[in-house]
């Protein structure tokens, strides 16, 4: 086995978001927020920004709770989002993500303050105006719909989760890539709200809206949304010039994959049912991947056809290690080398 140093340090976690406060002179409000700045940020290179809008249950003044329901994205797509500025403001207790406060269009509400925070961060850190992404859950899902309705030209992509939008202004949203998530068993905000928005956008001529209607899922649709690596691959492939032409195409980026000596992909995380820890011969532990039906046969055949040749394991797009199989795989699973267990820890939910 030949081990290569993986780029583990390029994967951010929720713990990397630092605590700050923003004073909004227009409304007189002070907005707590957390922010992640990519390592080696270069302002002249223009960096994408991801705005996270929490739900009603995460309101407060601790400047921490607002990231609680977003943590799944760091495990699922930490490598993808680590190249962006991540912004997570917190709405105070007993308040709401309202754009306006005293009158229509005044933008003195807490969401108005969050919008100006986004503008301030974009200016201070060299944010890319063509790659501004937004997502929110529940109350934050409602806020996501509200912001893209008010500023449809400012966002490259949006992911409202179990929210409510204004279907009467769906024509505003036909030029922005949108991916909606909502559980059919949601008793807090019924999925009819997302059904209505999806159908309204389609009726208005929108061609870049997708709807993940999650059967049997309750109000916690965010657990599915933010563990969906495919969604983040899609999101971070969107840019304003491209999306305005109706093109929201993208390429999936594997988190982990095995490649044969002939440079053929044998499996990726999409082919893995679950991971588990197993005792290794050296007294430590290895991580094993239980493979989907049929993939085991593909792996076994690849071993037979490439006997004595090197296979390669890639992690977050970088070569992790190579190995020459000693025998055919057993128990329909693939066991990663014990020497890389520490690097693969985030694959397992302990």
Regions found by a protein language model. Give the residues of each.
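Primarily recognizes the serine-hydrolase "nucleophile elbow" in alpha/beta-hydrolase
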Residues: 123-124, 130-172
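Gly/Ser-rich "nucleophile elbow"/oxyanion-hole loop immediately N-terminal to the catalytic nucleophile
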Residues: 40-45, 97-138
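The conserved beta1-alpha1 loop
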Residues: 53-55, 182
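Active-site machinery of serine-nucleophile hydrolases
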Residues: 49, 56-112
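C-terminal catalytic histidine-bearing segment of alpha/beta-hydrolase fold enzymes
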Residues: 177-181, 185-248
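A domain-start/cap signature at the N-terminus of enzymes
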Residues: 1-48, 142, 197-199, 209-210, ...
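A structural signal for conserved, well-ordered secondary-structure elements
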Residues: 245-350
């Amino acid at each position: 086995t030949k081990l290569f140093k993986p780029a583990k340090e390029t994967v951010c976690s929720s713990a990397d978001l630092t605590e700050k406060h923003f004073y909004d002179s227009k409304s007189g409000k002070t907005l707590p927020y957390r922010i992640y700045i990519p390592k080696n940020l270069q302002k002249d290179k223009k960096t994408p920004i991801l705005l996270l809008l929490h739900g009603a249950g995460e309101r407060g003044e601790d400047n921490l709770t607002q990231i609680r329901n977003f943590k799944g994205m760091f495990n699922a797509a930490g490598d993808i989002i680590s190249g962006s500025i991540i912004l997570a403001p917190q709405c105070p207790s007993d308040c709401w993500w309202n754009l306006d406060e005293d009158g229509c269009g005044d933008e003195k509400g807490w969401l108005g303050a969050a919008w100006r925070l986004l503008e301030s961060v974009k200016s201070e850190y060299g944010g890319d105006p063509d790659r501004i992404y937004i997502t929110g859950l529940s109350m934050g899902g409602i806020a996501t719909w509200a912001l893209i309705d008010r500023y449809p030209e400012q966002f490259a992509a949006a992911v409202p989760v179990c929210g409510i939008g204004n279907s009467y202004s769906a024509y505003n949203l036909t030029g922005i890539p949108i991916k909606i998530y909502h559980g059919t068993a949601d008793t807090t905000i019924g999925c009819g709200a997302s059904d209505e928005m999806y159908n309204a956008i389609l009726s208005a001529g929108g061609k870049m809206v997708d709807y993940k209607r999650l059967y049997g899922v309750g109000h916690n649709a965010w657990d599915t949304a933010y563990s969906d690596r495919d969604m983040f691959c899609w999101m971070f492939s969107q840019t304003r010039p491209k999306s305005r032409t109706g093109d929201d195409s993208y390429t999936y980026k594997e988190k982990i994959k095995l490649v044969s000596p002939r440079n053929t992909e044998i499996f990726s995380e999409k082919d893995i049912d679950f991971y588990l820890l197993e005792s290794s011969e050296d007294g430590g532990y290895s991580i094993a991947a239980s493979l989907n039906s049929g993939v085991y046969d593909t792996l076994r055949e690849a071993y037979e056809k490439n006997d004595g040749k090197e296979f390669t394991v890639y992690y977050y797009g970088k070569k992790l290690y190579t190995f020459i199989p000693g025998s055919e795989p057993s128990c329909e699973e693939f066991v990663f080398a014990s020497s890389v267990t520490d690097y693969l820890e985030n694959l397992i939910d302990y």
